[in-house]
């Protein structure tokens, strides 16, 4: 019997794959407005600092294909066909939905490579996918809104944190800073669950890994005049050092799933500048990337979503 094909729509932010794509990528983020020469030079310098371009494009491909491979090892009657849809660079989300339609895919499950729900990220990805499917008459897409409580995801971070804590001279002198991408403060007025989901993730992981001292921070805020969620991780580091005198800071950007510009530059370069300035130790566990433990956790998320549909 031929296996039923189901589309696996993996959505992510996207990143420039080469230097020539930096300007059009940021122009898309800015809704068609080109960045100034000064802003563009700053962006190019950041990419140069992490090796020229971000490894995110490669990692996202590995995550999408790896997730499909894990799912297909588990399934007997279904074959998942991966489609990558990106927010700010090709293949765009709409391209992926169109390709599924062209390939004869009638049913798909979508997952965003971000564990926490927010109106700015996950909701906007799912909305774009659904609107395109409605426009072209299919496929039927079953969306996933968040997966930060998935046991395998939490277990992955628990193990990473425990391994990294072994490097600290004293657990009492260590502070773990859990972080995610900052968003405009106005999401709080809209009752967006994003900040609370980060807090919940931090509490769960601190409990699982027996972390005695931890705080919540925000990072990588946009360059706009409106207020963004804080405290910023760098300011928080200075404040905690002044008040508590911690000798080691461990940064856990649990809102991200890959080593990209926000981690390799904003954490490994900018936060490390702060810890060096304070004369304290900098630690950061390896990110999920395409780690098998992480891919299995995502596979569990997708399988549960599909089961909920089938059993209705």
From Swiss-Prot:
Its EC number is 4.99.1.9. The gene is cpfC. Fe(2+) binds at residues 181, 262. GO terms for molecular function: ferrochelatase activity; metal ion binding. GO terms for biological process: heme biosynthetic process. It is an enzyme of class 4 (lyase). It comes from Shouchella clausii (strain KSM-K16) (Alkalihalobacillus clausii). Fe-coproporphyrin III binds at residues 13, 30, 46-47, 54, 125. One of its GO terms (cellular component) is cytoplasm. Its main location: cytoplasm. Pathway: Porphyrin-containing compound metabolism; protoheme biosynthesis. This is Coproporphyrin III ferrochelatase. It is found in: Cytoplasm. Transmembrane segments: none annotated. It comes from the Bacteria. It catalyses: Fe-coproporphyrin III + 2 H(+) = coproporphyrin III + Fe(2+).
């Amino acid at each position: 019997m031929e296996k039923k094909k189901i589309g696996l729509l993996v959505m992510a932010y996207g990143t420039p794959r080469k230097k020539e794509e930096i300007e059009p990528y940021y122009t898309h983020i800015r809704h068609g407005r080109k960045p100034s020469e000064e802003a563009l030079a700053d962006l190019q310098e950041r990419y140069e600092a992490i090796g020229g371009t971000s490894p995110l494009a490669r990692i996202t491909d590995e995550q999408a294909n790896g997730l499909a491979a894990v799912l297909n090892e588990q399934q007997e009657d279904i074959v998942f066909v991966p489609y990558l849809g990106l927010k700010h660079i090709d293949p765009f989300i709409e391209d992926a939905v169109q390709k599924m339609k062209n390939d004869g895919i009638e049913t798909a499950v979508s997952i965003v490579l971000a564990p926490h729900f927010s109106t700015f990220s996950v909701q906007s990805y799912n909305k774009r996918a659904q609107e395109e499917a409605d426009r072209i008459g299919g496929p039927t897409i079953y969306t996933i809104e968040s997966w930060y409580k998935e046991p395998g995801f939490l277990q992955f971070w628990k193990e990473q944190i425990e391994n990294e804590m072994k490097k600290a001279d004293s657990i009492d002198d260590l502070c773990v800073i859990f972080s995610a991408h900052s968003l405009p403060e106005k999401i709080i007025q809209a009752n967006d669950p994003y900040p609370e989901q980060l807090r919940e993730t931090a509490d769960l992981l601190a409990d699982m890994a027996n972390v005695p001292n931890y705080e919540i921070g925000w990072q990588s805020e946009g360059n706009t005049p409106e207020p963004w969620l804080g405290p910023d991780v760098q300011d928080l580091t200075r404040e905690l050092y002044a008040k508590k005198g911690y000798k080691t800071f461990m940064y856990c950007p649990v809102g991200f799933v890959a080593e990209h510009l926000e981690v390799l530059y904003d954490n490994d370069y900018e936060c490390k500048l702060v810890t060096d300035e304070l004369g304290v130790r900098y630690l950061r566990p390896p990110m999920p990337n395409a780690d098998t433990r992480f891919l299995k956790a995502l596979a569990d998320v997708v399988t549960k979503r599909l089961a909920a549909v089938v059993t209705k």
